[in-house]
Amino acid sequence: MSREKEPEKGKRKGSGRDYTKVVCSFCGRSSDEVSNMVAGPDAFICDRCIMSSVEILRKEISAIKQPSKEDGDSFQPRLISPKNIMESLGQYVVGQERARKSLAVAVYNHYRRIESQEWVRDAEDDVVIEKSNILLIGPTGTGKTLLAQTLANLLDVPFTIVDATSLTEAGYVGDDVETILTRLLQASDFNLERAERGIIYVDEIDKIARKSANVSITRDVSGEGVQQALLKILEGAVVGVPPRGGRKHPEQQLINVNTRNILFICGGAFEGLSKLIGRRVAKASMGFGSKVKAQQAEADPEILQKVTQDDLHEYGLIPEFIGRLPVISTLDPLDAKALRNILVEPKNALVKQYQKLFEMDGCELVFDEDALDKVVEIALDRGTGARALRSVLENIMIDIMFELPSMTGVTKCRITLGTINGDGLPEFSFEDSDTKKTA
């Protein structure tokens, strides 16, 4: 039985190259001086040169590489300057300059913080920037939700809205706080990298305020209990989330979501907060006039701007919860002028939306100025801010939009004051006709 001939010492089988006397093509060290030597077609490189090359490349890449969505392992939101963020918000939200500026700075710093975590490698030189969640305080219909929604669209990050009134402590009827993260995952198509850079807007946050200043023997599962449950999520923690929502149960596969870089924006009307602030402001004036001054302070439309963390604590938010919402911004009530501007000025103004719908049917929609003023007057009386504008217009336009698709030759529809008051019909113009007809 013949045996295969062993290669000569120092030579690889099937090769005439001698590997006992090789040297590194970069540093000149021989194979005896290093641990490993990698051979190429016409060159050699030792393990020391490989390690040096890796270190050089790592430093160069960390210095010049910018994060982008194309990076498979590093999704980064679109970073925009605070000034541009504020201007972009102003295209959709009328007024509220102070709130827009505060949001712009807070959001910019938040995503700058994420960027610094990704690219700063030297822990000794790294200053840890703490997370800054946001609390929006303002009457209903002033644009809190719209501000958060517009921010998410502007930055191209996943966004979800959660109603705080549906949340309860674990083990009670209602939604666990983890369902917040489930909805964000769903909004990101279960892309975990995107979800962990998203924005969550928690609406009606004032409704989970402690029901009483005194500790009760009965558990407040939808108030203080929810605040306690939200603490770790707001601050930043790895949370196991059921992918399809619902309650956790044994043997269920969970998705671990790190909330460290998720921006939480909490909003609420905080009815009655102005009275607390007014009483505090009036305490500085003791005597017979203190009660009058308290009433005057409560009536001040800018009283919410004087809110402090102590006021929020007295309202019913626990100190730990307040501490995790360091950026507090207030929104002003909407007056008639602001409502009038909301109707026509923003990119997605209500009047523009209805005009677009009519344009799809080949009809131009026109509102008389006094008709718009009347819409504002009715909405102002309802006291629900900008939400009332849509309700008023929808009631007026529903019959017109029902009939329009069945009408032929209509080129223009004019809404008059009489149409708004209900004692007149809209005026229609038709093709090849100078006459105007009412519906």
Curated annotation (Swiss-Prot):
What SMART domains does the record point to? AAA, ClpB_D2-small, zf-C4_ClpX
* Binding site residues for ATP: 139-146
One cellular-component annotation, GO: HslUV protease complex
Q: Which GO annotations describe the biological process of this protein? A: cell division; proteolysis involved in protein catabolic process
- Any Pfam family the entry gives: zf-C4_ClpX
Q: What domain of life does the native source organism fall in?
A: Bacteria
Task: Tell whether Magnesium is among the UniProt keywords.
Answer: no
Q: Does the keyword Nucleotide-binding apply?
A: yes
Gene Ontology molecular functions: ATP binding; ATP hydrolysis activity; ATP-dependent protein folding chaperone; protein dimerization activity; unfolded protein binding; zinc ion binding
Q: Which residues are in the ClpX-type ZB domain?
A: 12-65
Q: Which Gene3D superfamilies match?
A: 1.10.8.60, ClpX chaperone, C4-type zinc finger domain, P-loop containing nucleotide triphosphate hydrolases
Binding positions for Zn(2+) per the UniProt entry: 24, 27, 46, 49
Q: Which UniProt keywords apply?
A: ATP-binding, Chaperone, Metal-binding, Nucleotide-binding, Zinc
**Protein family (similarity comment):** Belongs to the ClpX chaperone family.
> What is said about its interaction partners and assembly?
Component of the ClpX-ClpP complex. Forms a hexameric ring that, in the presence of ATP, binds to fourteen ClpP subunits assembled into a disk-like structure with a central cavity, resembling the structure of eukaryotic proteasomes.
Q: State what this protein does.
A: ATP-dependent specificity component of the Clp protease. It directs the protease to specific substrates. Can perform chaperone functions in the absence of ClpP.
Annotated protein name in UniProt: ATP-dependent Clp protease ATP-binding subunit ClpX
